[in-house]
Amino acid sequence: MAKGYYVKFETPKDLVNPILEALRAATQSGKVKKGTNEATKAIERGTSKLVVIAEDVEPPEVVAHLPILCDEQGAAYAFVPSKQDLGKALGIDITSAAAILDSGDAQHIVDQVISSIAKIKGETGK
């Protein structure tokens, strides 16, 4: 399946597993909002540490606003290849997006992911 037009940068394959691991750990020891609506609210409230968006969302309009909103609010965001992988990391079947509010024991991983994403976005000029 082709990536949605909302995918602003290529997330390196070696960064996908740390992103999913951060979600798993934050789900167990911190606070994570699941779903596009909950992620949107967290971004608007300025409480999200990291927003993760699936690349294979159909129709893409469901999540197309998230990268724009994250950029406006200064929130970190990343993409993962599939909504199945994203859902599995959160302990559910599928989800299009998630927002880490409190990273709990995953703080170190989340900080590394945010730093890596900032470098990637800096290189692509977005």
From Swiss-Prot:
Family annotation (Pfam families): Ribosomal_L7Ae
Keyword hit for Lyase: no
Gene Ontology biological process terms, A to Z: translation; tRNA 5'-leader removal
Cellular compartments per GO CC: cytoplasm; ribonucleoprotein complex; ribosome
Localisation per UniProt entry: Cytoplasm
UniProt keyword annotations, A-Z: Cytoplasm, Ribonucleoprotein, Ribosomal protein, RNA-binding, rRNA-binding, tRNA processing
Single GO molecular function: rRNA binding
Organism domain of life: Archaea
Function: Multifunctional RNA-binding protein that recognizes the K-turn motif in ribosomal RNA, the RNA component of RNase P, box H/ACA, box C/D and box C'/D' sRNAs.
PANTHER family: RIBOSOMAL PROTEIN L7AE FAMILY MEMBER
Family listed: Belongs to the eukaryotic ribosomal protein eL8 family.
Subunit structure and binding partners: Part of the 50S ribosomal subunit. Probably part of the RNase P complex.
Protein name, per record: Large ribosomal subunit protein eL8
Species in which this protein is naturally found: Cenarchaeum symbiosum (strain A)
Species classification: Archaea, Nitrososphaerota, Candidatus Cenarchaeales, Candidatus Cenarchaeaceae, Candidatus Cenarchaeum
